[in-house]
């Protein structure tokens, strides 16, 4: 019987592949037989991750591009097509926050750093839209494929301090649903877009907000754990099941859906 969860020989582009979650994604997909496009800004890290995948028997290519620069993305797409001849999937994993956009408790909410907020919005929202414009067009023209966006619990629950990030992720949820409808109507039932909304996972961007230098939890970190029924942070590999499902034929009638992978954070009232 055919394995409907298989991603073997699918060419899947992963943006943000030089980050923590992206690293987990590319390794898991390569282990499952996918051909991975490792897209990121840091050439040294991207090349090393490709080297690691190849040494472990997988197939991958480094695609050096900034997700907010259309010309770089177009060049990356051509490189992938020249190497592999097709693109079957896209994972929009690039994103994150920046210190200047974090709103501290003592900061006047009427004196926000608008420039920083715009930068965070640009990275997270348009850093999802632009790769979709470039790679998604190729996927759609081929007649079959899947696009997976990475959202966040910050799109569903009010999480203090991270306004720009929260707004961007909320917009990604809206974009996912809107674009899924248009893809289905214009290109048929074999082109899909969905999103994964992770709960709280430790990343380079949020580590200083959630943990102290000695590894203990900050007050904010403890609040997150308190409001997560599973009583812990998520691990990157715990996103893989949802990711593979959405990229594979196992989810062929699923589109416009935001899948929560959050240890129950989104459903718990705190009581």
What do these predicted regions represent?
Residues 2-3, 244, 255-271:
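Short C-terminal tail/terminal secondary-structure segment
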Residues 11, 18-19, 42:
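Conserved glycine-rich cofactor-binding loop
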Residues 34-49:
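Conserved glycine-rich Rossmann-like NAD(P)H-binding loop of the short-chain dehydrogenase/reductase
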Residues 75-82, 101-122:
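Active-site Tyr-X3-Lys motif and surrounding loop/helix of classical short-chain dehydrogenase/reductase
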Residues 110-129, 144, 148, 167, ...:
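Catalytic Tyr-X3-Lys loop
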Residues 132-133, 177:
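A short, exposed helix-loop element centered on a Lys and neighboring polar residues
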Residues 152:
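Residue(s) in the substrate-gating loop at a strand-loop-helix junction
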Residues 187, 192, 254-256:
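Short, small/polar-rich loop/turn modules that mediate ligand/substrate recognition or access, typified
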């Amino acid at each position: 019987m055919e394995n409907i969860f298989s991603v073997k020989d699918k060419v899947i582009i992963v943006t943000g592949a030089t980050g923590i979650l992206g690293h987990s994604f590319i390794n898991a997909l390569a282990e499952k037989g996918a051909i991975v496009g490792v897209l990121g800004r840091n050439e040294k890290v991207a090349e090393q991750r490709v080297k690691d995948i190849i040494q472990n028997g997988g197939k991958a290519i480094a695609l050096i591009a900034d997700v907010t620069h259309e010309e770089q993305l177009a060049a990356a797409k051509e490189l992938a097509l020249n190497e592999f001849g097709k693109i079957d999937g896209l994972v929009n994993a690039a994103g994150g926050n920046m210190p200047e956009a974090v709103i501290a408790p003592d900061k006047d909410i009427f004196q926000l750093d608008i420039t920083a907020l715009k930068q965070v919005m640009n990275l997270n929202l348009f850093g999802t839209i632009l790769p979709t414009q470039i790679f998604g067009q190729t996927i759609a023209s081929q007649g079959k494929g899947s696009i997976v966006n990475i959202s966040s619990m910050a799109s569903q629950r009010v999480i203090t301090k991270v306004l720009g990030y929260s707004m961007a992720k909320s917009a990604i949820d809206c974009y996912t649903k809107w674009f899924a409808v248009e893809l289905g109507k214009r290109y048929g039932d074999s082109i899909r877009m969905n999103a994964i909304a992770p709960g709280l996972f430790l990343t380079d961007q949020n580590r200083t907000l959630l943990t102290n230098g000695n590894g203990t939890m900050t007050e904010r970190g403890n609040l997150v754990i308190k409001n997560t029924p599973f009583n812990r942070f998520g691990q990157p590999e715990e996103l893989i099941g949802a990711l593979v499902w959405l990229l594979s034929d196992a989810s062929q009638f699923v589109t416009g859906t935001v899948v929560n992978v959050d240890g129950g954070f989104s459903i718990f009232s705190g009581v």
